[in-house]
């Protein structure tokens, strides 16, 4: 996975 998507993954895990 590219670094640009890591924050999006964390957000999805929190929701």
UniProtKB/Swiss-Prot annotation:
Q: Which domain of life is it from?
A: Eukaryota
Q: List the keywords (alphabetical).
A: Antimicrobial, Fungicide, Glycoprotein, Hemagglutinin, Lectin, Plant defense
Q: How is it modified after translation?
A: Glycosylated.
Give an example GO biological process. defense response to fungus
Q: Does the keyword Kinase apply?
A: no
Q: Does the keyword Glycoprotein apply?
A: yes
Any GO molecular function = D-glucose binding
**Oligomer and partners:** Homodimer.
Further comment: Hemagglutinating activity stable when incubated at 65 degrees Celsius for 30 minutes. Hemagglutinating activity is reduced by 50% when incubated at 75 degrees Celsius for 30 minutes and is abolished by incubation at 85 degrees Celsius for 30 minutes. Hemagglutinating activity is stable between pH 4.5 and 7.5, but is completely inhibited by incubation below pH 3.0 or above pH 10.
Q: What does this protein's UniProt record list under function? A: Lectin that binds strongly to galactose, lactose, D-raffinose, L-rhamnose and cellobiose, and less strongly to D-glucose, D-xylose and L-arabinose. Does not bind D-galacturonic acid, D-fructose, D-mannose, D-ribose, L-sorbose, maltose and sucrose. Has hemagglutinating activity towards human type O and rabbit erythrocytes. Has strong antifungal activity against B.cinera with an IC(50) value of 1.2 uM, and weaker antifungal activity against D.turcia, F.oxysporum and Colletorichum sp. Lacks antifungal activity against F.oxysporum and M.arachidicola.
Question: Which cysteine-cysteine pairs are annotated as disulfide bonds in the entry?
Answer: none
Give the protein name, as stated in the record: Antifungal lectin AMML
